[in-house]
């Protein structure tokens, strides 16, 4: 089963693993072993923006952090036109562009989205999701 991790989930995975629940960790490990652990390319943009804005501290530049993520076997999914259009068309979804792109990426890939974002978890749309704290 493919899983797509929300940005904060990958941040937790890379340095705050204790914030991830046991079920989420197990699912990510299993997916990574099958080349089914995914991250939206947009998450790397989001991390770089948070670092540049001083809202997130990293032990290395964002480019080096990205390389470490990819070395774990996590597959980077580019933002396509299909993803962009679907992101814009999500009904009754929060307006945050990153959340929209990440959710649309999960939907187009048929992946379970692992997130702790309450707004995404509460959304009524057809999305397989798992609370990252579980």
Model-derived features with residue positions:
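Active-site neighborhoods of divalent-metal-dependent phosphate/nucleic-acid chemistry enzymes
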Residues: 59-63, 70-118, 131
